[in-house]
Amino acid sequence: MGVGIQTMWSILLLFSCIFSAASASVSYDHKAIIINGQKRILISGSIHYPRSTPEMWPDLIQKAKDGGLDVIQTYVFWNGHEPSPGNYYFEERYDLVKFIKLVQQEGLFVNLRIGPYVCAEWNFGGFPVWLKYVPGIAFRTDNEPFKAAMQKFTEKIVSMMKAEKLFQTQGGPIILSQIENEFGPVEWEIGAPGKAYTKWAAQMAVGLDTGVPWIMCKQEDAPDPVIDTCNGFYCENFKPNKDYKPKMWTEVWTGWYTEFGGAVPTRPAEDVAFSVARFIQSGGSFLNYYMYHGGTNFGRTAGGPFMATSYDYDAPLDEYGLPREPKWGHLRDLHKAIKSCESALVSVDPSVTKLGSNQEAHVFKSESDCAAFLANYDAKYSVKVSFGGGQYDLPPWSISILPDCKTEVYNTAKVGSQSSQVQMTPVHSGFPWQSFIEETTSSDETDTTTLDGLYEQINITRDTTDYLWYMTDITIGSDEAFLKNGKSPLLTIFSAGHALNVFINGQLSGTVYGSLENPKLSFSQNVNLRSGINKLALLSISVGLPNVGTHFETWNAGVLGPITLKGLNSGTWDMSGWKWTYKTGLKGEALGLHTVTGSSSVEWVEGPSMAEKQPLTWYKATFNAPPGDAPLALDMGSMGKGQIWINGQSVGRHWPGYIARGSCGDCSYAGTYDDKKCRTHCGEPSQRWYHIPRSWLTPTGNLLVVFEEWGGDPSRISLVERGTALDAKKL
């Protein structure tokens, strides 16, 4: 190619790129989001990048695309990206730019929910814990320290996206951004400061000039030009606060979260499809499945408190990235049917006619197109309806879609996809376990602090660990009557949560724990004390920090008292104001026993002398990765409570000892769904299997470390492959 021609080609290419970026635009009217001048029905799904591994991302995105999605929606997780003030992290599972670019490579759009409050059953709602200790701070209100920190992080994310040219107006995939998150109920509770904060947040976000619309979910008074959107199991009755804004549903709840101690929620595919079709027929044009792939709360990222390590959410793609049938396929077919109506849906508003006492037709008819949705809202009875000269059979609680106003191509209750059954197949058991017992900490050790009275746990640990020791000495005189009459004194402890192990003179006296509904707990038990000095050691254990509510700066955990000892010669002692010695974390954590190098720093016991069913015990074993690429999990059904690591990476908290309470029974797709309906695994562990990402393994010599708080039988831990088997018949 000649120099002149090459120069001309370069100029043309440059102008082409400039024109392409300049012509890219995102706007909206009352019908839809408008991308580059085209009104779109947009189907989205939530995939949270830190809840899977970078190696999983391409397959998850591809399966989302194959499932008929146009958009991937994700939160931005502030505490993962700014673990300490001004120190940012965007690597590995937190490589946000890489994730967005992978979405772009598949030709999908992105809805970036910057927040930076996320809720999401994520630790502290996504806020970094250091934020709680900024002087004068009050969270999510008209408070200058909070607004300054929030604006700084939001600007950081927007600047990164702009630098990588990731907004649609730059030729990138981001078509929408979200500021704040479900703030409406909080604003209603706190009043004027909340309203001022909402106005400030909207103005701040719009001022960042991203070139794409901003949204606020569950925010009825979202200031213009911000679009208010709906979250919920159903959103057909939602209307945006201005007639010129589109009807958007940012969270179609495909299931519900699992909490330790709770049954496992499911939501029938038919009802999810029904809710979506009902939203579309009522004029909705953007919907997002929360979650499309839930993933895993690796490490200590689970919030709640008491959120399980699994964030499966009964999503169309399960925790391991496998399609959940029939939900994935049934929704794929729904999306195809909706897309076949797109031209009519974005052109006109529907006309609604009654077809029966509990049946309706929603018809979108323009000069060139006609699409109809025939709905049966009856939860018990099928009906035959007449429409446009034809007869249509509508099962209970269902909607049929007719892209040409004549031909039914889809009904939400008629499932064409095959159902699948989960299979967990053992591939490795009989690990060569070794044990190391974590001895009870004493007050005279190093790295301890002695203070007058009881102190809040997170204030001391700064959430660097789940564990905080509270220690004091109880001196018993030789003349105490209980030493002779055998009536042991009653020790009573009140804690803000979340779990507590009580040790006296190195021996476990009892364990208590709370729940998501009531994280506070109390211990009250007659205890064995001897004449002289008795060592009382309380191991307070957090199980994730709350992710929703008001006044985050006031939340607490740990032993706040009172602590009393009743049944002494002098009556009852109030020990709350005594001198207490504090130690953050465990010895094993400080030694790094979960790492290859740290695990060699102590003497481990193996064989017949190995500890079993002992509290505060570390276990380690090595194993080779099984062949193949099937997803892997650990079956922890024989263990109590603790944490798991693979090659130094934290799988998360295990707690199979917390048995699911509640009621499980028959599940009908028909009728209004809520999170108490269609629950499973009552009377079983809330979570038995724990996801082990393939990418964390090497072919040989993988280090598996388990810390067990209660005591368990590690010999029964096994590595399993997760797979699915399709039912022979269609539903």
From Swiss-Prot:
Signal peptide: 1-23
GO annotation, cellular component aspect: apoplast
One biological process term in Gene Ontology: carbohydrate metabolic process
Any single Pfam family the record assigns to this protein: BetaGal_gal-bd
Catalytic activity: Hydrolysis of terminal non-reducing beta-D-galactose residues in beta-D-galactosides
Carbohydrate attachment residues: 459
Functional summary from the UniProt entry: Involved in cell wall degradation. Degrades polysaccharides containing beta-(1-->4)-linked galactans, acting as an exo-(1-->4)-beta-D-galactanase.
Family listed: Belongs to the glycosyl hydrolase 35 family.
Protein name: Beta-galactosidase
Protein species of origin: Malus domestica (Apple)
